Amino acid sequence: MGVPCIVMRLILVSALLVSVSLEHSDMVCAQTIRLTEETDKQALLEFKSQVSETSRVVLGSWNDSLPLCSWTGVKCGLKHRRVTGVDLGGLKLTGVVSPFVGNLSFLRSLNLADNFFHGAIPSEVGNLFRLQYLNMSNNLFGGVIPVVLSNCSSLSTLDLSSNHLEQGVPLEFGSLSKLVLLSLGRNNLTGKFPASLGNLTSLQMLDFIYNQIEGEIPGDIARLKQMIFFRIALNKFNGVFPPPIYNLSSLIFLSITGNSFSGTLRPDFGSLLPNLQILYMGINSFTGTIPETLSNISSLRQLDIPSNHLTGKIPLSFGRLQNLLLLGLNNNSLGNYSSGDLDFLGALTNCSQLQYLNVGFNKLGGQLPVFIANLSTQLTELSLGGNLISGSIPHGIGNLVSLQTLDLGENLLTGKLPPSLGELSELRKVLLYSNGLSGEIPSSLGNISGLTYLYLLNNSFEGSIPSSLGSCSYLLDLNLGTNKLNGSIPHELMELPSLVVLNVSFNLLVGPLRQDIGKLKFLLALDVSYNKLSGQIPQTLANCLSLEFLLLQGNSFVGPIPDIRGLTGLRFLDLSKNNLSGTIPEYMANFSKLQNLNLSLNNFDGAVPTEGVFRNTSAMSVFGNINLCGGIPSLQLQPCSVELPRRHSSVRKIITICVSAVMAALLLLCLCVVYLCWYKLRVKSVRANNNENDRSFSPVKSFYEKISYDELYKTTGGFSSSNLIGSGNFGAVFKGFLGSKNKAVAIKVLNLCKRGAAKSFIAECEALGGIRHRNLVKLVTICSSSDFEGNDFRALVYEFMPNGNLDMWLHPDEIEETGNPSRTLGLFARLNIAIDVASALVYLHTYCHNPIAHCDIKPSNILLDKDLTAHVSDFGLAQLLLKFDRDTFHIQFSSAGVRGTIGYAAPEYGMGGHPSIMGDVYSFGIVLLEIFTGKRPTNKLFVDGLTLHSFTKSALQKRQALDITDETILRGAYAQHFNMVECLTLVFRVGVSCSEESPVNRISMAEAISKLVSIRESFFRDEET
């Protein structure tokens, strides 16, 4: 055999081996294909097994009897029949996502949006290197975002929004070079904005809304030239308006609302971002003027910059924005209360597509122009409230046929309401409160069948309440209080099935409260106080089972209290200043939610119950009912006589009548003698001491003057410094003792040399004289006289609080009496005090006939009685909202006192903002944080922008509630009994929510007290019982 044969044989053998090898390879490939198809199937079945049985039914086709590629939501490739897409969006599936999903190696699209998946996102998803579309939004996923998702290098869409994901955005996401959409909004993400995202040059949409990401926006973002949608609203970003955003000239949608951006906006803003259609920048701290160049953005459709600190005029050039749909500039400082402030409204008549216009709560002045009637007929909301706009509402308002909300409240408007309002059939809210409007309420308002809110309170409307309002069948809140309305309450109002609030207080209404009041099944609050209503209180009130506030005081109701034992949700019940008679029902002691009960100045007789609300004299009042007996000892009522046996009852009755008649005659004779003596002394005193002050203070004197200067001088030792217990904005407070029982009192002497003190005196008398609440300090009497040198003298005499003020308890080391180790407050006591203060503020803000803003809530104005119950004091700063003296408004508000105390005063007060109940909310929030941290807002720790609010907020984000808590609390025993961290965290959150810088971001006092009471019930149930 030669070499050629050997070679030939080797070639033949090699060919055979190759043939065998190829055949084996084909077999292996076929087997591999079969295995991988089976792998996809098993992966999906494993996925199904992790879905709860109740929601698994929609995956019924996922079984061995049907081909894999025909399963619900499954898509396969045409060539290899491998699974390339899984779309289970919106199927409401519950469970966890199986890690076997990572075995779907050909998967290009995975949609699990709008389900209820929970747990962590499996890291195995990072194995899907072909994945282009991943949507897991609107689920319940928690934990961190898996860094391995950055391995999915083909991703163009990544949507993990609306979950509970935590920690930061992975820096590695900067390597996803094909990413077009990145949506991580509505999670709990923290940390900084990754600069690496500047590498995503294909990115067009970025959404980080509603997280807790902080810091500044990195300059690298300027490289995202294709960006058209950029939303980082409701985070914690700070610094000036992000400079790199000015380079994103392709932007169509920009939202940075609800952060802490500050500084001014560039004048060329509109030239740099010429393609914007939607611009949201509200709830930040921007200052300066609105850039005129915004009007160069011809495509602009929505411009919303509320709740900042913008000043200057609203540009007339906005009239060039032909596509404008929405303009929101409310809660700034735009305008200067001058006549030209509203000129922009004329320019906006050119914006024919305008649907929403809100410039409320600025500094706009001038007359309401008639050309507002020429605004777009597509306008659905017109809000100009909270300014100083004068003039009248033009008849042409009826041209705005699409209007749903009309808010002109808290202005200086006068004149009559135009009947054309009734032509606006789409109206839902009419808010015209706190103006000087007069005339009759137009009956045409009854034509607005869909009306839900009608606020006409605090005007000068007269005439009767239109019966046509009974046609407004969707009315929820009807507030006509503090007007001059007369006649009776129309029975048509009792036919409103959805009415929740009915307030007709402080009018001149007559007649009975109608029996058909019981038809209002959903009524939460009924206030008919201070009218001239008569007759008996209808028994049908018992049918209003939702009632929480029933205010009938200041009328002429007669007869007994009806059986309303079914109204177990009552919180405030005031029947005072009527002619009611009979006994006080025992069942009222079972009203467990009742916070305030006032039965004073009636003709009730019999025994006062001793349980429930009747155990607390600060929560109820029965004075002025001379025939009452019994009750708890502190009421100091006569004891109830023991009932006599029946056989002697008639004789005893005759004896009782005779004796009573004789005693009454003697008493009357004595009273006449006393009165004549007093009258002679009174005339002599008036002639000797009273001068022109009689004219200024006569309404107050006639009701309050019960004590002389001489008495106060003696009881305070000549106003000696040894009896000085404090001082405030308008004077000093001394301790004294009055009456035969030497009752301790606190005497507040007003400093009349300080501007506003006399007005403070009148305001405080008016405020305290008309309200009663267990957490408000009680006014005992006043003195309006002259001192020994003939100078005017004004003093308020309060009930003395033996435990001083809250400031002494929170900061005992700063008081001279540092040796008192018992002056400490535990967690439960502090929470109770906070709830007491909140309760007083809710009452002032909501249940007085005019809302009252205290304007100086701070620990030294919170007094503690012997039981450590808190009482809010010092109404010297209180302004009765909605009743400002229009002529001297600016003078009154410019006084230093009304702006509150540094550290506790709301930020808007420092910028000329109106005194408001939301300012009290801020002050309460700061006090609440001080109560539990033990740190004053003026602590030297708070510098360089750090405040008690931001200090607490930062600690909450880091879950360090215990680290900022007052050590006195931590030394207590509570930590052994319950989760103190959770309790403190919840309390701090309430304080932070109340003390937000912008008023619109603060919760109401009603919401605050609800949260605090809920915390107490959750953690201190044993202590309460």
From Swiss-Prot:
The modification Phosphotyrosine is found at Y798, Y843, Y904. Residues 1-30 form the signal peptide. The keyword Cytoplasm does not apply. Residues 719-1020 form the Protein kinase domain. It is a single-pass type I membrane protein. ATP binds at I725, G726, S727, G728, N729, F730, G731, A732, V733, K748. It holds the Pfam family LRR_14. This is Putative receptor-like protein kinase At3g47110.
